[in-house]
């Protein structure tokens, strides 16, 4: 699986595990994703996938490197897709 595929899977998993917000974003904590069995089977390097998604402005979270235990309560936000301009 390449990085783009992993980021796509990450988006699906955040939608599955997270709470939808009024603005169309989804929020979930790092601990929920990290401790989910399905995510553990999909992502070889969850932190690397999160960093790639953050770099692409698909997700946002505080900090650079998330560590199990220390950052379990850090909120990860899957940003809503950009609005399509009306023609």
From Swiss-Prot:
Q: Which top-rank group of organisms is this from? A: Eukaryota
Extract the Pfam families matched here: Costars
Gene Ontology BP, a term: regulation of actin filament-based process
Q: Which family does it belong to?
A: Belongs to the costars family.
The name on file for this protein is Costars family protein
Which organism is the protein's source?
Answer: Oryza sativa subsp. indica (Rice)
């Amino acid at each position: 699986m390449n990085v783009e595929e992993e980021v796509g899977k990450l988006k699906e998993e955040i939608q599955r595990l997270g709470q939808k917000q009024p603005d169309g974003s989804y929020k979930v904590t790092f601990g929920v994703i990290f401790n989910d069995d399905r995510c553990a089977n999909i992502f070889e390097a969850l932190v690397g996938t999160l960093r790639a998604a953050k770099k692409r402005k698909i997700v946002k979270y505080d900090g650079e490197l998330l560590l199990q235990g220390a950052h379990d309560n850090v909120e990860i936000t899957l940003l809503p897709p950009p609005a399509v301009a009306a023609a």
